[in-house]
Amino acid sequence: MNNLNSVFDYEDIQLIPNKCVINSRSEADTSVKLGNYTFKLPVVPANMQTIIDDKIAEMLAKEGYFYIMHRFEAENRAAFIKKMHKDGLIASISVGVKADEHAFIREISAEALIPEFITIDIAHGHADSVIKTIQLIKRLMPQTFVIAGNVGTPEAVRELENAGADATKVGIGPGKVCITKVKTGFGTGGWQLAAVKWCAKAASKPVIADGGIRTHGDIAKSIRMGATMVMVGSLFAAHEESPGQTVERDGQLFKEYFGSASEYQKGEHKNVEGKKILLPHKGSLKDTLKEMEEDLQSSISYAGGRDLSALTKVDYVVVKNSIWNGDAI
């Protein structure tokens, strides 16, 4: 590992501006290439039950955004691939690593239901089980782009890439509804951005930063540290279209948001590493995506460039936990 003393997180970093070369931020190009596809934003909503469902996946794909469907209604996945392909859209699904998931991978391969993207999605992705799953997918569906995770070390990134992963997802428990760090003592909570930097340095393929994103500026910071794509949970939760339950408290509307290993999601009290919270209702998801795009265009203009590559070259300073001056986000 790198120097373990020089760790930092999103709130510790400020990017330093360069001379602006565009007349308006609307000229800035926020698009990103992943595999054989180009997407409108370097952002993907988290593949969680309270963030994405079939309808949202379809809307995102139609509008040119990347998405990853969650794996918590396993029996619907084959039909989902079929429907997306029938509509001329890309299919991007999640799988686990157990025997029944391997059977599912064999089944869709045999039926020629080949998704463009598969994300192997487990909490501790630096595992033999993940390596075996990558190898199985690549053997049966060599054209499918495989994202594997989640990991938090350069060693893990190298191993998963060597096994055949096309991208790795970095982040162990830094998310708002993830309590891995509390329950286990392990994780990248508090130093997620440093983990992204170290992992991206070791990577020869794209890295997806996953977790700990609290503001749109954090997306720009992730790209500066080497992420190709940024997975966002809580910022995408609690919208009009979001799957979570709407709850009214004292005249204000809230929506449920829970972690992928929470008892609410698992329906049990076993191996719980997630919690449930209520977030204020946020209006339309399309409005949030537009605002994200505009903020990222502003970031590019501050970086002195015309596209996302400008963000990878800016200088930054470490200002330990002080950019909020004690204010909560």
From Swiss-Prot:
Gene Ontology terms: biological process = purine nucleotide metabolic process
Which reaction equation describes what this protein catalyses? Answer: IMP + NH4(+) + NADP(+) = GMP + NADPH + 2 H(+)
Q: Which GO terms describe its cellular component?
A: cytosol; GMP reductase complex
What InterPro entries would the database entry show?
Answer: Aldolase_TIM, GMP_reductase, GuaC_type_2, IMP_DH/GMP_Rdtase_CS, IMP_DH_GMPRt
Q: Which domain of life is it from?
A: Bacteria
* Class of enzymatic activity (EC top level): oxidoreductase
Stated EC number for the protein is 1.7.1.7
Q: Where does NADP(+) bind?
A: 207-230
Where do the catalytic residues lie? Answer: C178 (thioimidate intermediate)
Function field: Catalyzes the irreversible NADPH-dependent deamination of GMP to IMP. It functions in the conversion of nucleobase, nucleoside and nucleotide derivatives of G to A nucleotides, and in maintaining the intracellular balance of A and G nucleotides.
User: According to its UniProt record, which protein family does this protein belong to?
Assistant: Belongs to the IMPDH/GMPR family. GuaC type 2 subfamily.
The record ties this protein, via HAMAP family, to: GMP_reduct_type2 (MF_01511)
This one is known as GMP reductase
Q: Which organism is it from?
A: Lactococcus lactis subsp. cremoris (strain SK11)
